[in-house]
Design a protein with these regions (language model features):
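Glycine-rich phosphate-binding active-site loops on the catalytic face of alpha/beta enzymes
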Residues: 51-53, 96-112, 202, 225-239
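N-terminal amphipathic alpha-helix/helix-capping segment at the start of soluble metabolic enzymes
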Residues: 1-28, 121, 278
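Structural preference for beta-strand elements that scaffold enzyme active sites
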Residues: 8-10, 23-27, 54-56, 76-82, ...
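Hydrophobic or amphipathic alpha-helical targeting/insertion segments
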Residues: 77, 87-128
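Catalytic alpha/beta core domains of metabolic enzymes, predominantly
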Residues: 132-135, 140-279
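Glycine-rich, proline-tolerant flexible connector loops at the mouths of alpha/beta enzymes
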Residues: 29-37, 48-75, 104-108, 171-180
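Active-site mouth loops of central-metabolism enzymes
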Residues: 13, 20-39, 58-60, 77-85, ...
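Alpha-helix-loop-beta-strand connector modules within alpha/beta enzyme cores
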Residues: 61-83, 115-127, 187-198
Length: 279
């Protein structure tokens, strides 16, 4: 099976290329308190061992921002800082990390975004515009009445166009909803109006089982349509499981080849060997 991928601009997050003809990369996010450097680094090493290609950490306060250099020094894969509400944290993180994620729905006035652009430009690192159905701009909620796919796409397009108007194109975009249909529609709408590389995911997908199913359906469909340049499977579980599921989704679509592809009988009364153990 050959999937014709959408043509997107290529950016680099550290040594990982995203978009263009680069393979779809798999990323995850630490579930530790970032201020707990020992626990965070330990989890990062587990993710690296599982093959995770980009790792994001939450930066909710100054204390978390201050320990980013220690965390970065202990890593072999690119580090992404996740910022909400306070653009000053993005300015501090930009001095250390390989990419900064901001949410246009809660970062505040445009002058704050301009300061973030200046900070990431100084180190030639990209920005992720992370739109989320739970934190859309008020005027879009009033316009559409709810966080609809159209509202998500418009939020992302508005942010991208505003950034492009000031000459900033070193970015990737995500449009996340917890409903699979809404997420698919939002990504589809955006993908047909922009060549920005896309980070795909289903937010708040659920526990290990339900989240894996929802993500496999949502991300699998998008990828089968050629949409998606990097992905995260969001699970209320061990982040290592996110990496495993992510690679399995890509393997099932023949977009990545990693590890052994196990083809196993589902078992029935005719089985005379331990299929589960062998698989």
């Amino acid at each position: 099976m050959h999937i014709a991928r959408r043509k997107t601009r290529q950016i680099s997050v550290g040594n990982v290329k995203i978009g263009g003809d680069a393979p779809v990369s798999v990323q995850s996010m630490c579930s530790t308190d970032t201020r707990d450097v020992v626990a965070t680094i330990a989890q990062i090493h587990q993710l690296e061992a599982a093959g995770c290609e980009l790792i994001r950490v939450a930066v909710p306060n100054d204390e978390a921002a201050q320990v980013l250099p220690q965390i970065k020094a202990a890593m072999t894969v690119p580090l992404i800082a996740d910022i909400h509400f306070d653009h000053r944290l993005a300015l501090k993180a930009a001095q250390v990390v390989d990419c900064v994620r901001i949410n246009p729905g809660n970062i505040g006035a445009w002058w704050k975004v301009e300061e973030v652009i200046k900070a990431v430009n100084e180190r030639s690192i990209p920005l992720r515009v992370g739109v989320n159905g739970g934190s859309l701009e008020r005027h879009l909620l009033e316009k559409y009445g709810w966080p609809s796919p159209e509202a998500l796409a418009e939020s992302a397009l508005n942010a991208v166009h505003a950034l492009e108007d000031v000459g900033f194109t070193n970015l990737k975009v995500s449009l996340k909803a917890s409903d699979v249909h809404h997420a698919i529609d939002a990504y589809w709408l955006f993908a047909h109006q922009s060549d920005s590389p896309l980070h795909i995911g289903i937010t708040e997908a659920g526990t290990a089982m339900t989240g894996a199913v929802k993500s496999s359906i949502g991300l699998g469909y998008l990828l089968s349509q050629g949409i998606g340049d990097t992905l995260r499977v969001s699970l209320a579980a061990d982040p290592v499981d996110e990496v495993k599921v992510g690679f399995e989704i890509l393997k099932s679509l023949e977009l990545r080849h990693r590890g052994i592809n196990v083809i196993a009988c589902p078992t029935c009364g005719r089985v005379e060997i331990d299929v589960v153990r062998m698989a």
